Amino acid sequence: QGVQLAYHHHMGTIVETSEEIDLLMENTADSLGLLLDTGHLTYAGGDPIATFEKYQNRIVHVHLKDIRTEVLKDAQNRNLSFLDSVLNGVFTVPGDGDIDYLSLFIALREAQYSGWLVVEAEQDPAIAKPLIYAKLGFNNIQHFAQKAGLNLTVPWA
């Protein structure tokens, strides 16, 4: 009681694409929330902003992960596995890739989203130093939030 369940779509699972998210949402009760993962949805060819707008009443958690489109195209051209794509640097922190985070943050503000926003990178720590990228991601989401007029609460501040 009092616990909100949410499904996390993810590459390598039964729900990866926008169409599969649609099927999940259409065939489950409204009480099941959705964790929107911007990087994984973009990797699967989806649009995180359109998905947020479509399911904003059921999204209870957001993973903010950016994608490097050129690395993704190279991985697709070479038929690399998902894991090899990750190791080649397909993902990064928000603002260091090609997802339109300003538009997403405007949509979050307009929907009065109040759930968690969690920065993820899924990068090789030997190449992308975690502390450097954690700071970069934090600074970038602060910048996008300010430009979008979205007030963020930092849990440790």
Question: Across the structure, where does each feature detected by a protein language model lie?
Answer:
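Alpha-helical packing segments of well-folded alpha/beta enzyme cores
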Residues: 1, 51, 100, 104, ...
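Conserved, mostly hydrophobic/aromatic
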Residues: 5, 37, 62, 108, ...
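A generic secondary-structure signal
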Residues: 23-27, 107, 140, 144
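Short, well-ordered coil/turn segments that N-cap beta-strands
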Residues: 1-4, 28-33, 58-60, 111-115, ...
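Active-site beta-loop-alpha junctions enriched in small/polar residues
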Residues: 10-12, 37-41, 65-67, 91, ...
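Gly/Pro-rich active-site loop or hairpin
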Residues: 18, 22, 42-114, 128-132
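C-terminal helical cap(s) of enzyme catalytic domains, especially alpha/beta-barrels
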Residues: 128-153
